[in-house]
């Protein structure tokens, strides 16, 4: 049975709960409807099922509890508790997530949407500005029948402004919701939140650290646009030191065979050594270059990013030095291959000239749209399982 067929079948939903909470091994089979969050049962000794520590068994009226019931024949890779960093995914899990995302495109095309997450609440805690990530997560939740508790600027308009710790905020918010989507200005904040929470946490960007859901939609987009992931050549351009999207993308692309990455950036924002060392350890070929035209002529994907002014603090002279050095324009398009695409995590400023938008190889708005499907898939898998 494929993941998509599991998703489309309404005959049975199976999940498991935190094994720390009980010595009882149980399973919950709920017929013909998704689980509400009204009841939680616990199981332990679940290694045989590939059950991870925070997986939940959510069930409601009409649920049947059985002892030692077999679950889906899936491995540890399919148990998803949190989405914190790109390294946590293996290739099989990526393929499974993409399969669910494709099924979500059909739901998106249905004007009535879906009610599979009816009764679930998602809390968005955003300590940094966001348009696409926050709105796409909120849209994803609502299109699946769930509801949203939102904070647009938690750094200024929440108890964080009064000095409350992130951990205390998470402990409070998890009492109001079933899943937390967190964007924070500190690298590592999402990992701290996940260690604190007993509900799923999704990292929507932690400072210059990572942005795993963006990387998932990026790889999903590359596969849809280019038709393959093995053997691709990708040029990462712009702010590679502060851009969390390129870090997460590099980690994910390392899962595929015969990939080559090119790093094109001003000297002050070069790719950090930890990424280079990781790629080398995985046998991924990478090369630094100062010639965008040459790299663009070789690549399947030119992944442009903005220079992140907010990360420079008072060193604005360095920002001005970096800004405008590498711009995707008509000259770059002329040397690109016909099948190649330009991608960008957005927002874009002047690093892509406006007339590039009209070229069919400009994939960044299609890329943003794919974010909805990936985030719908993540919410479904984290809250209901496969």
UniProtKB/Swiss-Prot annotation:
The keyword Plastid applies. GO terms for molecular function: amino acid binding; aspartate carbamoyltransferase activity. Carbamoyl phosphate binds at residues 132-133, 183, 211, 214, 346-347. Keywords: Allosteric enzyme, Chloroplast, Plastid, Pyrimidine biosynthesis, Transferase, Transit peptide. The keyword Plastid applies. GO terms for biological process: 'de novo' pyrimidine nucleobase biosynthetic process; 'de novo' UMP biosynthetic process; amino acid metabolic process. Pathway: Pyrimidine metabolism; UMP biosynthesis via de novo pathway; (S)-dihydroorotate from bicarbonate: step 2/3. SUPFAM superfamilies: Aspartate/ornithine carbamoyltransferase. It catalyses: carbamoyl phosphate + L-aspartate = N-carbamoyl-L-aspartate + phosphate + H(+). Gene3D superfamilies: Aspartate/ornithine carbamoyltransferase (3.40.50.1370). Pfam families: OTCace, OTCace_N. Belongs to the aspartate/ornithine carbamoyltransferase superfamily. ATCase family. Homotrimer. Catalyzes the condensation of carbamoyl phosphate and aspartate to form carbamoyl aspartate and inorganic phosphate, the committed step in the de novo pyrimidine nucleotide biosynthesis pathway. This is Aspartate carbamoyltransferase 1, chloroplastic. It comes from Pisum sativum (Garden pea).
